[in-house]
UniProtKB/Swiss-Prot annotation:
GO terms for cellular component: cytoplasm. PANTHER family: TRANSALDOLASE (PTHR10683:SF31). SUPFAM superfamilies: Aldolase. Its EC number is 2.2.1.2. This is Transaldolase. It comes from Helicobacter pylori (strain P12). One of its GO terms (biological process) is carbohydrate metabolic process. Belongs to the transaldolase family. Type 2 subfamily. Keywords: Cytoplasm, Pentose shunt, Schiff base, Transferase. The lineage of its organism: Bacteria, Pseudomonadati, Campylobacterota, Epsilonproteobacteria, Campylobacterales. Pfam families: TAL_FSA (PF00923).
Length: 316
């Protein structure tokens, strides 16, 4: 399935030096993503950073973070570079800008350009959240020929608006990261069993349709947050359900490994628009509106990344 790509949503130094290379070499993945929460988890809990942190003592916390994070990003970039050179639609690693800059477009643009210039790798994507100021940042980076990963996309309306900007302005590869499982975690406790474990996939499918209206060879939907939040679901539930043409799925290791044991051999056919609308109508009988939920989840996602980043900086 050449039009579906699997990426790894995990970063940690020991992993990059070992299992990450194995996954690439056996053709299991062709890209990777990182975020502030993943870096916080890796750097604060892994022993592989401690010697370097000790040597950096006395420097500012953000400087320590960037030294560690950029080293990991460069290592991932090098490992993925042969894939990028073979096919420039694949082989990317993503790095997110400082989450505390999300409401300041000018500072976000400056930081994104600085990080991209410092890394100096064509297969690095700069992650920009789909916040209010994010639109200006996305436009500026697209015009500057910087590969972009627009993250924390929950709303189909926002997904379509972002795709429209990128279709006009993107000169390099761009992905729109549609978050999936958080919808089910939010909505499932509020609905009967026959409606559970569906909201995330249905909302993501509507986002996919919105993006597809503007997608070209540079722009793809990337399904993110595809690890299950419920023990009742198969670990690879969201990967299998969203195996669409011209899409990418970035998955945590547990979901990734489960999927690789029994991967899809054919693309999934997305639900029809009429089926999506019927489901949304049924949700409304339970006083649930997916667009309102999307706005809530975006706010929570922005806060969560700030909290993780703050926790990481304080650990230094």
């Amino acid at each position: 399935m050449q039009e579906f790509s699997l990426w790894c949503d995990f970063i940690e130094r020991d992993f990059l030096e070992n299992d990450f290379l194995k996954l690439i070499n056996k053709g299991a993945i062709c890209g990777a993503t990182s975020n502030p929460s993943l870096f916080c988890e890796a750097i604060t809990k892994s022993a592989f950073y401690q010697d370097e942190i000790a040597k950096l003592k006395g420097k500012k916390a953000k400087e320590i973070y960037e030294t560690l994070a950029l080293k990991d990003i460069l290592q991932a970039s090098s490992a993925l570079m042969p894939l990028y050179e073979k096919n420039p639609n694949n082989g990317y690693i993503s790095l997110e800008i400082d989450p505390f800059l999300e409401d300041d477009a000018i500072k976000s643009i400056d930081e994104a350009k600085r990080l991209f210039k410092t890394l100096n790798r064509p297969n690095v994507m700069i992650k920009v959240p789909a916040s209010t100021s994010g639109f200006e940042v996305i436009s500026a980076l697209a015009q500057a020929s910087i590969p972009i990963n627009v993250t924390l996309v929950f709303s189909p309306k926002i997904a379509g608006e972002i795709a429209q900007i990128l279709a006009k302005e993107a000169q390099k590869r761009a992905v729109i990261s549609v978050f999936v499982s958080r919808f089910d975690k939010e909505i499932d406790p509020l609905v009967p069993k026959n409606l559970q474990a569906q909201s995330g996939i249905i909302n993501a499918t509507e986002c996919y349709y919105q993006i597809s209206q503007h997608a070209n060879k540079l722009i793809s939907t990337l399904f993110a947050s595809t690890g299950v939040k419920s023990n009742s679901l198969a670990k690879d539930y969201y990967i299998k359900a969203l195996c669409f043409k011209n899409s990418i799925n970035t998955a945590p290791l547990e979901a990734l490994n489960a999927y690789l044991l029994d991967p899809n051999t054919e693309y999934q056919t997305p639900l029809k628009i009429a089926e999506i609308e019927a489901f949304k109508k049924e949700l409304k009988t339970h006083n649930i509106d997916l667009e309102n939920t999307a706005q809530k989840l975006l706010k929570e996602g922005l806060i969560a990344f700030k909290q993780s980043f703050e926790k990481l900086l304080k650990s230094f």
